[in-house]
Amino acid sequence: MVEFNLESLGVSINLSFQNFKNDTLAGSLIPLKKGTKTDLSILLYEDKKKTVIQKIKKTEFKNCVKKVRGGSYCTFFDIDKRKTFSFFEKDVFLGFVMDHALNRSFLAFQNVLDIIFLHAAAIVIKERAYLFIAPGGGGKSTISSLAKENGFRVIDEECCIIKRIGNRFFSGVYPIKPLSDTSDKIWEIGGVYFLNKSNKSRTRKLSAIDAVYRSVPEAASFYHNWVPDEDKNEYKKRIFTFLNSMFNDVYFRLLDFKIDSDVFSCLTH
């Protein structure tokens, strides 16, 4: 049994494994609550005779077929019905297919779920989520350690989801992570800070367009290798539009911070 954090997405996903003779649960993806309608379905089909793989190779899904150790597999989507179909030959490792199907589903259904993924430390302060954005080595883990020392809850040190509900934006734990005490909740974003290591802690104003351009690479890198080359520009455009909307509604600043200081005392929001 495999469990994933999906409460934070505000949706439920059903993941089932079918071998054409019976249906068994391959993974348990936490529903929002009992009786919640399934928002997305991921169906994994094992084909012992390879007939499905061969049939799909002759259709428009041919480019979806991938060769891996143990055989072939393919994944495609029915956006209208919110379903993912993944077919694989019997010797392909089921865990690999599950992981692939989940990741491809999050990529394919980002518009449906109205979410993006972001490389950022997410910290809860006064029941609001504050995001701290920086490239690799820019201080996300450091600011998270300082937050823990100051008694704040850290949603995640490296990555999180951003979900839009109406005109409000929320942050939660990245869903394909081990279960934690933050897995069943999302927090409204109270502010976004762009980290800059310095010899002095202070906040500075930043233009909205600068905030967007600093954020796009930290979001577009998610699933970048999964996106077909012909769709990469559209993928980045969608992220740009989402972030532009977010920074019209969410407080943001540049944060110069000194590692050994109480950096949280200088936050201005």
Spans of model-derived segments:
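Glycine-rich, often acidic-flanked micro-motifs
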Residues: M1-L25, K34-S41, A121, I125-P135, ...
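Long, basic/Gly/Ser/Thr-rich N-terminal segments
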Residues: M1-S86, H269
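Short solvent-exposed loop/turn micro-motifs enriched in small/polar/acidic residues
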Residues: V68, D114-I116, I155
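Generic beta-strand structural signal
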Residues: Y73, R82-T84, D114, H119-A121, ...
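Short histidine-centered catalytic/ligand-binding loop motif
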Residues: T84-L94
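N-terminal pre-Walker A segment at the start of P-loop NTPase domains
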Residues: V97-F117
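Conserved glycine(s) of the Walker
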Residues: G138-K140
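Post-Walker A alpha-helix
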Residues: I143-S144
